[in-house]
Structures are given as C-alpha cells and as structure tokens.
C-alpha cells in the first residue's frame, strides 16, 4: 500500500507539500510557504525529517521551497533538484530571511545545511531509491523546474509541481509525453483552471504595442515582475521584437537570477537569444544607478511582481505620476495586492502610503501555468483508470476542472491534512 498525504496545497494555491509513503521509502515533494495579508508565513503540516528517504524540489518559487530549510535542523535527508533550482533557491531563502519581519524556523546555518544535501539532477535522469525510483522531467514552468515520476512499491505516481504545457520564448513546454499513459496517479496543480490563457502570439503583440506606444509618446515603461521566470521571459520577448532603442534595466534580485540562469543553458529553449538579451540589458547596482536610469526614457523590469515591495515601489513613486509613462503588470495580481488596487482603483496603498498613478496601467496574462483547456487535454492524455488528484488550486477552480471531466477519477475534495491510498 502507498499513501499520498497532502501536507500543503490542498484546496489552496501555495505552500505545496506532498508526502508519498511506501513500504521502503517516504518521499517529500516540495515544502513551500504562503504568506497572509500581513506577511506572516503559513507553513505546511509537520513532517519528521528523519523519516524521509528523499526530498524533491520541483522549482525555486517560495510557495514550493520556502519551508525547506526548516527540515535541516537535526536531520539531513537527501534533496533532489536541478543545479539551477538549487542555486535559485539559495537566493530566495536568503532574501526571505533578510526581509521577513516574522519568525522563520531557519537561519543561515539551516540554509547551508539544506544546500549541502543537494543531489543535482537533470531532465530525464532516473535515480534509484532503495528499490524504488524517481525520474525527473521538464515541467516548462521556470528554468530548471521538474515534474517527478515516482515508481514506489510498483505504483507509478506523477507529481507535476507547477507546469506549463505551452512553449514560451524562454522554455520548452512540459515533457508530458515521456510519461506512460497508464500510470496509477497524477498529483497535479490546477492554479489556472478558472480560465483559458489568450494565444501567446496575440499576447506578445499587445504587450509590444503597449511598450512601443509608450516609447513613441516619450514615456518610460515600468514592469514589476517576478524574480524567477517572468523577468527573463519578458526580457527575451522585448529583444525578440527588437525593442532596443532605449535602455532596458533589470533591478533587484532579478539581476542575480539572470546571472545564475545564464550558467545553465541546457534548461533554456534558445540559449543564444538569452545571451543576446543579457547583452542588451543593464543591471541596477544601487540607488545611484536607479537615479541615473530615471534621467531618460527607459524600460525597467524589477521585483516585486505585485508591488508589495522591492525596487518596483521606488520606481512607481517616480514614474507613476506622468501620463506619458506606462505601468505594465505581466503577472497575476492577488486581490489583496497593491497591483490589484491599481488595476481596479487607480491608486494603491503601499507601506501605509497612498500612491496615485496617472501613468497608463496595463495587465497582460503572461502565465507560466497551464490554463483550463490545456489541463483538460493533459488529463485526457492518461488512461481512464489513472487517478487524478488536484492540488495547488482554489476549491472553485478544482471543481470547475472536475466538472469538465465528470467521468474521471478526480479527487477534488482533498484538503490539507487528508490522504489517499493506492
């Protein structure tokens, strides 16, 4: 018998954590963190590190990795991740410790302990685990992200992590078709089961038109963006469309992520385009360079993607008042975020300061997740006998997906703390 327990991510987006227990091995898949409206961390359910045969990290976003170092205080289970994910996770861990105003169950020492236990893997690698096995496949979500195919006690289980079936400028789509169609269970995210993404070509065209129009009118473009994945995708999109007449600046943690990703071209769709994009971009190294960047027209890409902090707030205060400028939000904006406030009200309260924006405000759906139609096609790839467990999704979106697939074995009601048995 194999038990699959949801330690986090059941009926919610984020704090992803799945525990798979067989007769020989217990494998933890991700161990992420969410943050409440006040920035207080919300951790997955507890698991005893000494009981774990292995931990797999799908990618370096905090909602999948942010609680991991807390498991490396008194034990040291092996951690499997791509070398790119491991390096990106390090900067995310350290940034979280630096910026968190709340207690975290780890500090620098636990981060070092975590990284010492990394066993680097690449796409299509298979590792043996006391008679069971783990195979790692491209997830197409962010550079270095993996899906994991577990073969445990004779049962085959696919954990998607966050995945994207569609090709982007940065990445190839998820490698679904290397997975056998008759596996026993798919544990899949359904973050965006609430709708279908627009065609990528149309999205890029509208994004580039917004940038060009702003530049033609003498304005600058501010793009608040996620550090890992989104920043690089937008930079490549600009260079692909030859937007090189004004400087492109990268600020915040994104500039470090850019450098790390450049070391691992094997995880990119077009390494040459990536190198070209970095050549055309300029790093902001501090306040002196920020002031210089504002003297003339420019495109500035910087965290935080929802305007909850970071250098983006600095630029917003200085660029937001000019109608010639544009604020482009290329990511999901949570209802409690300043970015959402700007989209709906034209003003945002950030750090108890109300900021009114006269600049043009755009939102583009540059998602790195699969949409409803893709998720349906993904599920239909598998045999009818394959069980489907939906995680990392709101209850409403999970239900919507299941309604399209009523004949399938979809367990949409599992919440954090519940389990299924095979």
Map each language-model feature to its residues.
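A short, acidic, amphipathic alpha-helical segment used as a generic capping/interface helix at domain edges
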Residues: 310-316, 367-383
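His/Asp/Glu-rich metal-coordinating catalytic cores
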Residues: 2-12, 16-56, 61, 65, ...
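Conserved acidic residues
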Residues: 53, 184, 298, 325, ...
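Short acidic-hydrophobic, aromatic-tinged amphipathic segments that line or gate anion-handling sites
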Residues: 117-123, 278-287, 414
């Amino acid at each position: 018998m194999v038990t699959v327990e949801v330690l986090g991510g059941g009926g919610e987006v984020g704090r992803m954590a799945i525990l798979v227990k067989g007769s020989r091995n217990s494998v933890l898949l991700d161990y992420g963190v969410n943050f409440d409206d006040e920035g207080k961390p919300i951790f997955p359910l507890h698991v005893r590190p000494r009981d774990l045969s292995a931990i797999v990290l799908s990618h370096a976003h905090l909602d999948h990795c942010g609680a991991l170092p807390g498991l490396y205080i008194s034990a040291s289970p092996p951690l499997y991740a791509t070398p790119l994910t491991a390096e990106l996770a390090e900067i995310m861990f350290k940034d979280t410790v630096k910026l968190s105003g709340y207690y975290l169950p780890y500090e620098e020492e636990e981060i070092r302990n975590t990284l010492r236990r990394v066993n680097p893997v690449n796409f299509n690698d298979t590792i043996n685990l006391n008679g069971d096995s783990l195979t790692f496949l491209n997830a197409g979500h962010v550079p270095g992200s993996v899906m994991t195919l577990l073969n445990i006690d004779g049962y085959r289980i696919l954990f998607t992590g966050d995945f994207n079936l569609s090709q982007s400028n940065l990445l190839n789509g998820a490698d679904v078709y290397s997975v056998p169609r008759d596996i026993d269970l798919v544990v899949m995210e359904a973050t965006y089961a609430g709708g279908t993404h627009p065609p990528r070509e149309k999205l890029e065209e509208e994004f580039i038109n917004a940038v060009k129009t702003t530049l033609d009118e003498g304005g600058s473009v501010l793009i608040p963006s996620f550090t890992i994945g989104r920043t690089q995708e937008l930079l490549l999109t600009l260079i692909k469309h030859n937007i090189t007449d004004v400087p492109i600046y990268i600020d915040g943690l994104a500039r470090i992520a850019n450098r790390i990703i450049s070391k691992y071209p094997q995880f990119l769709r077009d390494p040459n385009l990536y190198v070209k994009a970095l050549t055309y971009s300029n790093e902001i190294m501090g306040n002196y360079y920020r002031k210089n960047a504002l003297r003339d027209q420019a495109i500035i890409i910087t965290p935080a993607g929802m305007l909850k902090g970071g250098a983006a707030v600095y630029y917003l205060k200085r660029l937001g008042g000019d109608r010639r400028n544009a604020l482009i939000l290329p990511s999901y904006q949570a209802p409690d975020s300043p970015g959402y406030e700007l989209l709906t009200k034209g003003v945002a309260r950030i750090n108890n300061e109300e900021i009114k924006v006269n600049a043009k405000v755009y939102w583009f759906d540059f998602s790195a997740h699969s949409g409803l139609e893709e998720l349906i096609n993904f599920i239909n790839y598998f045999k009818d006998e394959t069980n489907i467990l939906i995680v990392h999704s709101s209850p409403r979106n999970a239900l919507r997906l299941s309604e399209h697939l009523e004949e399938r074995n979809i367990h949409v009601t599992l919440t954090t703390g519940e389990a299924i048995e095979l």
